């Protein structure tokens, strides 16, 4: 994974490119919708508008999240990305509901389409552009772990699926004269958008509610610490996903007869062992003598 400065630069670049592509696609799709009258193209254009708004939210969230810790936010600003992702999910869900209602109305009152050849070529070009953007965002997410870019990527994965559905609907309507294919395609797209919004919201809430890392990750932390020389035990492991980094705290047990300096060195080694697992991590080890009887978080957590 890249260092914090490179991560921040890469996230900003990805959000800027996404915003530029989204603005271009919504303009082209709106023009095609006006020319054809296709409700599925309207759905795709509206999804593009959500993409523009979402990319703006993402850009703002990424910029704020990239700020270093300050006096008022000593844990940093990483949760801004999760907030941006949650806002995106709300925008996507709202668009899905509105377009779903319009699609159902068109099912009962079909409307003739025009210039479908133009619409087909516009959708093919839009699909290629969205697929290229998804490829770039996938790379950025793998390198940085950005929640906001991942949420933005989910929008454009949806956009690819939306465009394919629109393409199928227009082809069926033009070549097989299925006059409800356009409305059915739009309704299917709306349902997919709503499902995608649900997943985005749940993922954002995991960070906002300070959910623990997976048990497998906690077991890796425990194994890494227990593998350090001088460590006799570990308990009260506490973790949370902060968006651009993870936060890990634990109590490490050492021989009670050693010096404070020696115990401090063991604590540092255990922290470094965890940082080796999570390069973008804040790790705090509390050193205490082995066998001490005290109140433990492990005993309170059910």
PLM regions: where:
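Alpha-helical transmembrane segments and adjacent TM-loop junctions that form the membrane-embedded core
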Residues: 2-23, 28, 34-302
